C-alpha cells in the first residue's frame, strides 16, 4: 500500500477554581482489579450521595437517567444537563472516588464493574425497582458501545453497539471509510515492532503512530525519523502504554494542513471549528474556535464528507465528532469519534450557536425530541493553559483578573498549588483553559490573548526521578 491519501482503495462564567482532585486523580495509578465482578457484590456502602430523607416509595416516582462512568472534561456537564431536565442522575462507576463532586452535590453513584456487561444489566435491574429509568448513556467513548447493548436489552433509545465498536477501532474505521471512497490518510495496522518498521518504510516518514483504540491523544505521536519511530514503538508495544484492548497500533501517513472538527447530532452538522495544536511531536490542542473560517463552498464540501462518513459507519443516532485536515485535495478525514468531543468543544458550540449539545444528547437518550436550531451566530474560542515543565505547582494567579475581562465566558483550572504536574503529550497536559466569546473572530482572539496573559504560574522541578514516577497519569475514562 502506498503512502498516498486514500480515496476508495483501501473533533456565565463558571470558574471551576481549584478543581484539584480531578487533576490529582489524573496523576496516580489506576486499577480495576478490586472492582466487583457482579451487581450482586454492590453494597449499600458503595452507593454514594443518595439522599437519606428520600423514601423508597418516593424513589419509585422519580425518573432517573443512568450514566455509565463519566469523564474528566464533560462528566460534570452531563450531570448538570440531566438535572436541568428534572431527572435524577445515577452514575455507575468502577471507582466512585474518581468523581470528587458527587458527595458535595448529592449525586447517587453505584460501584459496579463497568467492564462487565452482566454486572451492569444486573445493576440496572436493581435500580429499576426504585426508579423509573428514562434512559442510559455515557460521555465516555470507551463505554458507549456498552451503553448501546444495555439500551438494546431494555428497549431504550440508544446507539447501535456494533457500529460504535467498529468506529472505536481506528483500523477498522479507516478500512470502512477507505472502502466507501472517503479521503483518509494512507495507513496500515501493526501488532509488533517489526511490523511497525515494515509499514513505516512503506508509508514513509514522517508518520503518525497511535493506538488503534483510545482517545484524548493518549499515545499519539508524530515520528519524524527512525529513532523517534523506534522509541515510540517501544513505548506503545513494550509495556509502558496502558491498553484497554489487545495491543494494536496504527501507522498512518502524516497529513498536513489546517485541522478542523465537526460537531454532529444525529445526521445534522451543528458546527465546524478550527483547531490549533501545540508543537510536535504531540497533538495537544492549543486553541479551538467556532465557527471555522470556511467559505460556503468549503463548508459544503466538508458537510458532504461528514455525511459520507456517517453513512459508511452506520452512525446517525446521537453525537459524533469528526476530525479532518484541509489539504490540496480538500478535506481528509483523520478520525470519526462516536461521541461529543470533550469540553470546551460543547461549551463553544453553545456560546457560538446557542445549541446545548449535551442537553440535546440527554433528550435523545430519554426519547424526547431534539431542538438543534441555531439561534445565534457569534465567535467562541478557547485557549488551553499548558504546563511548561514537569514538577510541583508553586502558585497560579491572575484567575480573577482574567475572568473579569469583558467577553471572557469561562476560566477552568484542573490544578491548585501543590499539585504535581507530569506531562505525557495528551489531553491531561492541560492544566486549564479560558473561553471567550465575541461578535467576530478578531475580537475573540484579542480577548483570549489578554485573558491568558493575565494568568501566571510557577512550577518547581521534581527533586528526583522517584518524585516524578510516583505520579503516573491516571487512565481516566474518556
UniProtKB/Swiss-Prot annotation:
- Active site at 339
Keyword set for this entry?
ATP-binding, Ligase, Nucleotide-binding, Plasmid
Q: Does the keyword rRNA processing apply?
A: no
List the InterPro entries hit by this protein, alphabetically.
ATP-dep_AA_Ligase, ATP-grasp, ATP_grasp_subdomain_1, CbamoylP_synth_lsu-like_ATP-bd, LAL_C2
The reply to whether Nucleotide-binding figures as a keyword in the UniProt entry is: yes
Matching PROSITE patterns: ATP_GRASP, CPSASE_2
Q: Which residues hold ATP? A: 214-219
What the entry lists under SUPFAM superfamilies is as follows: Glutathione synthetase ATP-binding domain-like (SSF56059)
Q: Which Pfam families match?
A: CPSase_L_D2, LAL_C2
Origin superkingdom: Bacteria
The terms under GO molecular function for this entry are: ATP binding; ligase activity; metal ion binding
Q: Cite the SMART domains for this sequence.
A: GARS_A
Q: Which residues form the ATP-grasp domain?
A: 174-366
Q: Which Gene3D superfamilies match?
A: 3.40.50.20, ATP-grasp fold, A domain, ATP-grasp fold, B domain
Instruction: Identify this protein by name.
Output: Uncharacterized protein y4rH
Please give the organism: Sinorhizobium fredii (strain NBRC 101917 / NGR234)
Amino acid at each position: 500500500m502506498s503512502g498516498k491519501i486514500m480515496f476508495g482503495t483501501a473533533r456565565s462564567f463558571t470558574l471551576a477554581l481549584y478543581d484539584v482532585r480531578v487533576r490529582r486523580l489524573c496523576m496516580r495509578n489506576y486499577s480495576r482489579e478490586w472492582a466487583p465482578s457482579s451487581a450482586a457484590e454492590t453494597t449499600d456502602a458503595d452507593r454514594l450521595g443518595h439522599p437519606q430523607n428520600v423514601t423508597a416509595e418516593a424513589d419509585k416516582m422519580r425518573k432517573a437517567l443512568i450514566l455509565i462512568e463519566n469523564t474528566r472534561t464533560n462528566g460534570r456537564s452531563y450531570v448538570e444537563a440531566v438535572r436541568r431536565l428534572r431527572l435524577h442522575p445515577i452514575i455507575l462507576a468502577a471507582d466512585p472516588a474518581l468523581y470528587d463532586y458527587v458527595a458535595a452535590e448529592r449525586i447517587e453513584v453505584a460501584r459496579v464493574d463497568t467492564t462487565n456487561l452482566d454486572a451492569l444489566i444486573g445493576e440496572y435491574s436493581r435500580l429499576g425497582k426504585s426508579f423509573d429509568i428514562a434512559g442510559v448513556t455515557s460521555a465516555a467513548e470507551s463505554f458507549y458501545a456498552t451503553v448501546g447493548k444495555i439500551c438494546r436489552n431494555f428497549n431504550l433509545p440508544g446507539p447501535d453497539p456494533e457500529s460504535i465498536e467498529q468506529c472505536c477501532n481506528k483500523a477498522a474505521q479507516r478500512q470502512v471509510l477507505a472502502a466507501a471512497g472517503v479521503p483518509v490518510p494512507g495507513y496500515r495496522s501493526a501488532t509488533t515492532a517489526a511490523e511497525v518498521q515494515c509499514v513505516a518504510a512503506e508509508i514513509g516518514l514522517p508518520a503518525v503512530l497511535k493506538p488503534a483504540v483510545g482517545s484524548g491523544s493518549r499515545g499519539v505521536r508524530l515520528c519524524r525519523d527512525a529513532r523517534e519511530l523506534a522509541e515510540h514503538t517501544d513505548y506503545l508495544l513494550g509495556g509502558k502504554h496502558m491498553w484497554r484492548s489487545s495491543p494494536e497500533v496504527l501507522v498512518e501517513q502524516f497529513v498536513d494542513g489546517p485541522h478542523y472538527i465537526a460537531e454532529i447530532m444525529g445526521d445534522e452538522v451543528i458546527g465546524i471549528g478550527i483547531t490549533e495544536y501545540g508543537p510536535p511531536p504531540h497533538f495537544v490542542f492549543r486553541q479551538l474556535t467556532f465557527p471555522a473560517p470556511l467559505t460556503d463552498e468549503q463548508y459544503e464540501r466538508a458537510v458532504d464528507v461528514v455525511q459520507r462518513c456517517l453513512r459508511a459507519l452506520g452512525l446517525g443516532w446521537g453525537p459524533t465528532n469528526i476530525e479532518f485536515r484541509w489539504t490540496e485535495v480538500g478535506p481528509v478525514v483523520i478520525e470519526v469519534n462516536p461521541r461529543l468531543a470533550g469540553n470546551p468543544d460543547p461549551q463553544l458550540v453553545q456560546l457560538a450557536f446557542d445549541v446545548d449539545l449535551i442537553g440535546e444528547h440527554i433528550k435523545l437518550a430519554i426519547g424526547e425530541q431534539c431542538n438543534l436550531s441555531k439561534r445565534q451566530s457569534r465567535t467562541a474560542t478557547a485557549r488551553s493553559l499548558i504546563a511548561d515543565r514537569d514538577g510541583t505547582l508553586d502558585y497560579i494567579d491572575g484567575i480573577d483578573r482574567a475572568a473579569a475581562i469583558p467577553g471572557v465566558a469561562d476560566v477552568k483550572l484542573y490544578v491548585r498549588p501543590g499539585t504535581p504536574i507530569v506531562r505525557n503529550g495528551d489531553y491531561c497536559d492541560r492544566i486549564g483553559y479560558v473561553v471567550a466569546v465575541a461578535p467576530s473572530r478578531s475580537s475573540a482572539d484579542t480577548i483570549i490573548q489578554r485573558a491568558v496573559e493575565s494568568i501566571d504560574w510557577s512550577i518547581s522541578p521534581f527533586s528526583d526521578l522517584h518524585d516524578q514516577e510516583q505520579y503516573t497519569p491516571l487512565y481516566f475514562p474518556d
